């Protein structure tokens, strides 16, 4: 990578300086800081790809800019949840997003999040 932004479409993990690939899902990939002990970092880099999936299958062709749009929607919802619901007594909901200061190659399609224990449920 030469610092240019990429449309992340392939099944191959990206080589991101300072980050080590740890997991690939159907449409998102996870990286941890390269200088952290494997599995022990407090944060993860979540990168949304342009891949599309349905019924547990990745389909072709990828959708251009899908990863960037998915990331913007995710950040918007987390922001709304953190603000609480207007006119209701609902408390704001804490989220796990730490930063959007990510490598330039994945800017707009990635976020740094707190590492949490996952409860594997899919609806």
Question: What are the language-model segments listed below?
Answer:
Residues 2-123:
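Active-site loop/lid in soluble adenylation, ligation, and acyl-transfer enzymes
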């Amino acid at each position: 990578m030469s610092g240019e932004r990429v449309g992340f479409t392939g099944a191959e993990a990206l080589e991101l300086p300072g980050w080590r690939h740890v997991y690939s899902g159907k449409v998102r990939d996870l990286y941890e800081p390269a200088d952290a002990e494997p599995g022990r970092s407090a944060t993860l880099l979540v990168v949304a790809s342009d891949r599309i999936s349905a019924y547990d299958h990745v389909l072709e062709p990828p959708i251009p800019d899908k990863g960037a749009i998915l990331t913007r929607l995710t950040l918007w919802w987390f922001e709304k949840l953190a603000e609480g619901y207007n006119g209701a007594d609902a408390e704001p909901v804490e989220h796990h997003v730490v930063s959007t200061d990510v490598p330039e190659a994945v800017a707009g399609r990635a976020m740094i999040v707190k590492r949490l224990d996952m409860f594997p449920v899919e609806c």
